[in-house]
């Protein structure tokens, strides 16, 4: 019988444990983790994401504030705001919510955030540390959360064939390096790839992050595979909208060893690992070994 991986419960369990660690950090080390989120403009989806992040942070003892800026702000003004937070020693994590307005370079803003406070893990230096397999670096939250879900089903991934569909800097590429570090044989598929079904049919692990509803078909997936669906797409059925992933969940779920649902799979894990990254960042900035708090 297939396992429907409950990302919401796993994330809640992680955050419950994290809350206890934060209490210890405050009482024994006098470290009070603080996360600042910058939201530029009034994108409704971004507002929801930011609100969820702030609520979760506050619920586990992380001080959190959302700084809302107009979408007319210039790139230089935004950089100045980020630098103010960089210089504030009471702030341990800085997150600039993406996407940004078209007149602002996301790459430039991401790389303005201090490496030590880059809780998204998007800074070029943190990307390099991930590629090199360094310990205690800040790793993008969605891939890290996805790996945790995979290992909750199959702890030893050595020698497994893994396929990632999607090559974004946020999910696909960091996921590649995380699975490589687990000694998987990893293939990335993308919009120019041929024979996607053939590659997927040989995979023990499939991570779908392509942003196309129900893109991955049942006959692509081999029996007993682990499928992680990172996609979140809104489709209209009749007069109602429904959230679905990149995988044909109903068609795939009966043949796999395990699969994440949408919603309730990877999404909550992204927020949980943002909280973990904030704790790691606070520890590193205050000279505390994060491994004392994070397994």
From Swiss-Prot:
Reaction equation(s) it catalyzes: (6R)-5,10-methylene-5,6,7,8-tetrahydrofolate + NADP(+) = (6R)-5,10-methenyltetrahydrofolate + NADPH; (6R)-5,10-methenyltetrahydrofolate + H2O = (6R)-10-formyltetrahydrofolate + H(+)
Keyword Protein transport: no
Binding site for NADP(+): 166-168, 191, 232
Domain of life: Bacteria
This protein's pathway: One-carbon metabolism; tetrahydrofolate interconversion
GO annotation, cellular component aspect: cytosol
Pfam entry (one): THF_DHG_CYH
Record bears the keyword Oxidoreductase: yes
GO molecular function list: methenyltetrahydrofolate cyclohydrolase activity; methylenetetrahydrofolate dehydrogenase (NADP+) activity
Entry EC number(s): 1.5.1.5, 3.5.4.9
Xref: InterPro entries: Aminoacid_DH-like_N_sf (IPR046346), NAD(P)-bd_dom_sf (IPR036291), THF_DH/CycHdrlase (IPR000672), THF_DH/CycHdrlase_cat_dom (IPR020630), THF_DH/CycHdrlase_CS (IPR020867), THF_DH/CycHdrlase_NAD-bd_dom (IPR020631)
Keyword annotations from UniProtKB, A to Z: Amino-acid biosynthesis, Histidine biosynthesis, Hydrolase, Methionine biosynthesis, Multifunctional enzyme, NADP, One-carbon metabolism, Oxidoreductase, Purine biosynthesis
GO terms classed as biological process: L-histidine biosynthetic process; methionine biosynthetic process; purine nucleotide biosynthetic process; tetrahydrofolate interconversion
Subunit structure: Homodimer.
Family: Belongs to the tetrahydrofolate dehydrogenase/cyclohydrolase family.
Matching HAMAP family: THF_DHG_CYH
Physiological role: Catalyzes the oxidation of 5,10-methylenetetrahydrofolate to 5,10-methenyltetrahydrofolate and then the hydrolysis of 5,10-methenyltetrahydrofolate to 10-formyltetrahydrofolate.
Protein name according to UniProt: Bifunctional protein FolD
